[in-house]
Amino acid sequence: MIRSELLSYERPGRERQRVQLVRWDDWASLRFLRPGVGADALRETAQIYRRFLIPAAPWVFGQLLLFALPEGGEAELRAAAETLRRGLRLRGGEPRFSDKKTRALWETLSRAGCVELVRGRLPFLRVLPVRSSTGLLSESEPDARLRVNASFFIFDPFDCATRYDTVGTPFGLAVEDGEVLSPPLCGREALFVYRDGRVRVETPTLEDLTVRIGDKAFRPGRDGAVYARPGYRKTPRGRGFDHVIVGRTLVDVVRGGGCPVPASGFVLRLAEQTGEPGGAVAYGGMEGLLFGVQAGNSLVRGGAPTEGFVSRFWNVREPWRTPFPPSLYPLDYEKARAARIALGADAAGKPLLLWAEGAAKIGHRPGEDSCGASLSEFAAICRDVGMVEGVNLDGGGSAQILLDGKRALQISDRRDDGSEQERAVPLGLMVK
């Protein structure tokens, strides 16, 4: 049985905050949801850039070419991005090509409606490939009683740090019934639900896993060196073969080091090449978990609200200074307000899900609409409703809860007419 209630909190300056609290009885019913291919994912992503991201910080962005493929997989998408980066320039907003291959690709994409150009103030071009395997939660798994967005995913130019990163790639640990769907990254906290009923916030690492490539299994850090962000932008030069892994795919093998470290994955250096690019990767080591999801920061641990950043984030104002993990964050734990999603457990170990409604990015009415919550404010709310262990999931414009197909609150991204503009996401959670 799923139970929902709406709560309201008064804030200084006559602001208010609305929160949806959802409870149900068992973790076994919680599953990951993959929205699948969304026909409008490219267009909707470009609209988010045009309406919200670039107007908020136009001095950060140059010209952005977002594109998808009408057909083909991840390898083909990355190859197309490399072709466009090498052979395409924009002059006066018009494309110029250095070779016939690039021109042919551009014409194919243009005819299929798979190109979107958005403009910031800086004089450079960034090519951003967009995965087609993203979609709208509202159009996915319509029979599910509960749907909510989940972990972070690659979304902006800083996230697309290497040729291996594509917009719409989910990242961070995801475990379902002992199976690792994606590995842990970036030293961020995760919510672990053990088969024996324990629920805890922990910080998993790649060294906790075994990595299987083909028929061989390796322990990162013992059988081979592991390189990930924010520790490394490139692997050091040296002997061996760098195996570039994103999710459950071996995307490249580079000999001798100097390999870019993806924001959405990691590099495992082995003495010999194992497997071929495009091959499958599997993980072991989490068989004792019923469920696990990594995003961070924690909100409540041991019944006490978290008082500052524990998970590793990077300040959006200076992303170029060091190798940075994805999901750049405004590092003000106390004051930076936004829409938030929390997942955790009460004292009996039963699930709690909260959505703090964000301020509308267009047409916000102070005192009438929600103002959004800082992580500090949200942690206090989570503790007050009885959460004893819990983490923050992806928030902002992605934040929403659908219960029996309906939203009790509103998404913070809005169109000019005030209607909600839902973001396409690659991963969610559901209870059927």
What are the language-model segments listed below?
Residues 1-432:
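Gly/Ser/Thr/Pro-rich low-complexity, intrinsically disordered segments
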